[in-house]
Amino acid sequence: MTILLVGLGAALGAILRYQLTRIGNHIASEFPLMTFLINLTGSFCLGWLTGSQLSQPVTLFLGVGVLGGYTTFSTLNSELSQLWFRRRYHIFFGYWLLTYGLGLLVAAAGFYAGL
């Protein structure tokens, strides 16, 4: 049952991320805005979920499943690599610092909101 909960959640999270990315593709920018926003909202939600201390099945479905499928560490690092190799260093460092710096802050804010 646990595997099914996680798998269904991951599918829902991935579909949500895909749809949001499609919607945001019309924004012409070198800055990967949709990945940035997806990862920040996912960080906040996971922080909230952790602070809420919900039941294990709910946490597995939402945290490991939905938010695991929704957020994307691999896309973040792929985009960072592309920016670096295209010599877009100012965007690279801004994206890197904002994602990790704000990611920690919004996760902490989510945690405290969930208490």
UniProtKB/Swiss-Prot annotation:
Entry's transmembrane regions: 1-21, 31-51, 57-77, 91-111
Keyword Cell membrane: yes
Pfam assignment, any one: CRCB
This protein's GO CC annotations: plasma membrane
Keywords: Cell membrane, Ion channel, Ion transport, Membrane, Metal-binding, Sodium, Transmembrane, Transmembrane helix, Transport
GO BP, sorted A to Z: cellular detoxification of fluoride
List of residues binding Na(+): 68, 71
Reactions accelerated catalytically: fluoride(in) = fluoride(out)
GO molecular function: fluoride channel activity; metal ion binding
Location of this chain's protein in the cell: Cell membrane
InterPro entries, per the entry: FluC
Key word Cell membrane present: yes
Superkingdom of the organism of origin: Bacteria
Regions annotated as coiled coil: none
Topology within the bilayer: Multi-pass membrane protein
Description of activity control: Na(+) is not transported, but it plays an essential structural role and its presence is essential for fluoride channel function.
Main localization (coarse): membrane
Function: Fluoride-specific ion channel. Important for reducing fluoride concentration in the cell, thus reducing its toxicity.
Family membership noted in the UniProt record: Belongs to the fluoride channel Fluc/FEX (TC 1.A.43) family.
The protein's name: Fluoride-specific ion channel FluC 2
Source organism per UniProt: Latilactobacillus sakei subsp. sakei (strain 23K)
Gene field: fluC2
